[in-house]
Amino acid sequence: MSFTIPEGLAPEVYPLAWLVGTWRGPGFIDYPGIGERPILVEATFSADGGPYLLYEATTWELENPPANLEGDIDVVALTPGQMWTRESGYWRVPPQEAPGAATSTSGDDQPARTELEVLLAEPTGHVSVYLGVVQGPRVQLATDLMARTATGAEITAAQRMYGLVNSELMWATDMAAFGEEMQSYSSGRLQRQT
């Protein structure tokens, strides 16, 4: 994996530097009560000099889905349909003074494991706090807190995985919602646009 650390990026978030940029690509949602549908996701990780990354993502239903997610896909040619959801928030490495906020190696020739906190808000009436780790070009997250407004859907827990594979950002989300147990909700692959 070769990349350049963006100018002005706070040292605290160097373990997340590989995410900085705009990513776009197809995926699928498949969950009880929702059914299966192709989606288009665009996610942006940016920095403003603070000890965090700014994060924004928009998900649309996909107008012209590829036959499958294998092989080359021209993500610029994908057409967004109706917006499905948006989310925004902050990805941060906890201060080293914080209890449990350790950066450690996981063994010889393994990238360091760095603890991570992610705070997200959605216009559907949800806010969530995820805790997890970044290890090289891989992120594992699980909700520590989920809150909703009186009209927000009942989502009780979620897990996310992000990984850089062959220069593409693979992602998957599992969730427990609508009385269902934790299970796969969505997944896809994103290509770096900037």
Where are the regions that the model predicts?
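Hydrophobic small-molecule pocket/channel-lining residues, especially in calycin-type beta-barrels
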Residues: 1-194
